[in-house]
Amino acid sequence: MTEEQAQLQERADSHINYTDAINYWTETPPTVDGVLGGYGEDTVVPTMDVLGSSFFLRKLKSRMIVAQDHQKIGVDIGAGIGRVTRDMLHKFCDQIDLVEPVEPFVKQMDVELHDLKEQGKIGTIYPIGMQDWTPQEGKYWLIWCQWCVGHLPDQEFIKFLQRCKNGLQPNGTIIIKENNTPTDTDDFDDTDSSVTRCDKKFRQLFIEAGLKLIAVDRQKGLPNELYPVRMYALKPE
């Protein structure tokens, strides 16, 4: 390994550029196939993803009992076109906010989430990036972050998690569902200006943010050519 390669692996997150990421996703079709990088509804990925997430949440049911006088308010971070909210989160939450900075994706939410809006299941849509979002203190029963935190450098990710921690209800939970590298190093992808972190790095950053890992599971049934995907359930220390 050259010195340049070693530096790239050591600080993969230093190459993240928010503008490059927004430009990439703005040019991506606002469809399931687009937001999932070509693994749309003609593949097993959307179905297996929803099944895996639903199973993980059901396993956590006894550890996610809603506090007295609170509702099950969720927030979908890096929500894309609203796929996760539409297909899964609305079944677990009384109401869901969404955070998404890519304008064409936010516009597409009007289509994807139309029925849920009519049912009063959709709260506030924040058209901003994770790095600029501060949750209302004590609001959320569930903060769901899927396939998005790779756009945050390590220190920004820690700050984001700390803000999320402040946004939790009593007994609230943060869930991070993300790709992992199969090694102990992080990978930078200049296509969408994101980093894929190793499992070890995630666990380290959770500790630095003052969060305890209460459960972890690996997503099953995805194509072999994809990165491993893990779900991490977190609560404040």
Positions of the model-derived regions?
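Class I (Rossmann-like) S-adenosyl-L-methionine-dependent methyltransferase catalytic domain
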Residues: M1-Q136, L152-R163, T173-E237
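Hydrophobic adenine-recognition pocket in adenosine-nucleotide-binding enzymes
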Residues: C148
